[in-house]
Swiss-Prot record:
UniProt key word Lipoprotein: yes
Keyword Disulfide bond set for record: yes
Family: Belongs to the 5'-nucleotidase family.
CDD domains: MPP_CD73_N
Glycosylation sites: N88, N167, N327, N347, N361, N418, N532
Reactions mediated catalytically: a ribonucleoside 5'-phosphate + H2O = a ribonucleoside + phosphate
Listed name of the protein: Snake venom 5'-nucleotidase
Localization annotation: Membrane
Cofactor(s) the protein requires to work: Zn(2+)
Amino acid sequence: MQTPKRRRGAQGCPRSSPSPPLLLLVGAVWFCAALSVAAGSFELTILHTNDVHARVEQTSRDSGKCTGQDCYGGVARRATKIRELRANHSHVLLLDAGDQYQGTIWFSFFKGREVVKFMNSLGYDAMALGNHEFDNGLAGLLDPLLKHANFPILSANIRPKGSIASNISGYILPYKIINVGSEKVGIIGYTTKETPVLSNPGPYLEFRDEVEELQKHANKLTTLGVNKIIALGHSGFFEDQRIARKVKGVDVVVGGHTNTFLYTGSPPSTEVAAGNYPFMVKSDDGRQVPVVQAYAFGKYLGYLNVIFDDKGNVIKSSGNPILLNKNISEDQDVKAEVNKMKIQLHNYSSQEIGKTIVYLNGTTQACRFHECNLGNLICDAVIYNNVRHPDYNEWNHVSMCIVNGGGIRSPIDERANNGTITLEELTAVLPFGGTFDLLQIKGCALKQAFEHSVHRHGQGMGELLQVSGIKVVYDLSRKPGSRVVSLNVLCTECRVPTYVPLEKEKTYKLLLPSFLAGGGDGYHMLKGDSSNHSSGNLDISIVGDYIKRMGKVFPAVEGRVIFSAGTLFQAQLFLTWGLCISLLYFIL
């Protein structure tokens, strides 16, 4: 545990030392003030996680599969740090702000049993529901999580409708009062109201405005004599701040959904801080409310110390997310349980998903240089996974997908094993354990992304975008940055989907790998505003489910990515050079 550093005085010209009487007076004032604070104060330590996304095992620096020595997170390592902090602090709460579900093969196989097992083992005190907890429908939430959790699961803004209310009565609570030492702490949960678009909660749950519902329950807690209230939820950093400003009575906001990294000082790893930790928000009634998130994927453990006065006002808050790196050992008992469950994954990975009757070309020579049919299959699967809830204005809320060619790591041969596709083969195609996320982006930024896609085309570097719902024409004879000749996108606000020219000032929804959403492969223009970025499902789960549903697949090269005739000769020259580079890549 790091002790927060004291702020030093400003550096400048030497100052004369205060006289002894003045020092005594100042010391007396500070001593009396300290006594008055200590007399009625209560210190609470809040440990928190959010957006863990089924990272049961330790992961790489970028939260993919860990294959080397530089590994992070995992439930066993988190258990060690939690045990240490509980031993060193008197009043500790361990909270989760949602999206434990979805993200690795662990969830694909165990379907949440791994979540409830290890959250129970680590002794969580409360959890707010995230949108991904509904990915397997209400039934997949009810069993295993709701029925087997040893901790309260919260959301104040979810209202059941009709007969479903009796099925979940008592399982999803709006709030919970927890006795911490001699004090009562109220925790109110909330879930993004966009869940019906982002997941599969079904038609019988209503997701209401977070602020309105939180205020109702904060008022109720106040009437019950609770003056220390935490809002714990999953609606994103922007909404977390709105809650801090608007909801009277809420003292601390612990959030999730946008994978926001907050940190005071120099960050310990590759994440760039979106602000200080805690992020202080001035409420409309004049209070300073700390808002926190702890990035995602279990890489960090949020660590917030809050001091309340005897009236429940926050008088001090401090801390930082703790990087769970190799300097923290893994708890051996928890690790043994992880290894025991991991044995069951072996047979799962060899199961048949479906068949292909064509060669699924995921080679470097294909996907990094021109349109490839495996890239088309992947993006078509992602669009299919996100087709839901048409309305009068739109046939779907999103129509476009991109994936970088460098993220496609292997072909699948239709002549091997009679065209059978196994989970192991699909994992070889998409080995990084990433997700396909939803992003809102301006047309001008999307245009920049496609310029970046070919800014050094021919070098086999992996930036070339494979697409669905997009048609792009390039001219490689032009200078980098001006090579996009035309860019058409599939309309959503239409009854018959057709391709229309991209509008630079229009805001679009785009599906893309989490790697690109984080600015990977130089796509900094896609990183954008984290408040408009929603984490999605595991890539192999999306593609695997699509292949299962189709039974047999036969994706084609369809002219989604075209190089104009004037540049074909130039492209061939680049390709020859690129093949040499690719060979070196695989050798090294």
